[in-house]
């Protein structure tokens, strides 16, 4: 239970001020094991999403460009933050921090009482530096809204009957994570009565959009890595094969969705008719495989060929490639 003063503290506004400095942040990223650098809007979004149901919490971004790096530059920083808070109408009477060394500095430069929160890191025994150095090792400490940013994506490509769907399912199981199924199959069933005979040019943007939504869902709930059954280059290749031209919306998604690892399965496994496949001859399979390679290269997409002709060897090779990407030791 809270006494009167504590109850007042519980309902008063809280202000989270996120500092950023392009030069400093770039250096931190380059010294990290992160695959991409978060932008200022990325970081703001994480905070806004995390605290969106706590209406008394306000999120701000404070530009620290040109200020001496921590722990120096207190005079310049404190003058800057005073001006910033005045502009935002922030009148704090408490500062919360986990850094013991900062408490006297806040009092000296800002004249504000400081409340230490878990200064010994007994509850949250992690630092930002540790996460930057090895995000996957400290995965459980990364906030839910932030995890998708660190997720690695693996796209499995190949022609018809190359074993993509089964392989993606097995990989997701072995890595205990999510996968994005090929949306085109669901679309054919839900919109075309289960038969591609009615497929036309105007369907490809809808197929691509649905697949993008599947991918986004898989990434959002992934455990470090998400597996994608078929990419947008494959969708574009089918469009070019059947309609004689490429689709600009599909191309836009090719440009937007870049995967960390693209695996191209060789078309050297037995072809199995399932009612939705029509490129079963050796000539058709070879032509489509060549088209995939051509379009991958045109779009400057690096890929790894998996040429093993039996499913078990193919699976083990893919596991090896994913582990290498994740930085795991054999």
Where are the model-predicted features located?
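Short, surface-exposed acidic-centric catalytic microdomains
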Residues: 15-72
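Glycine-rich phosphate-binding loop used to anchor ATP phosphates in small-molecule kinases
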Residues: 206-257, 272
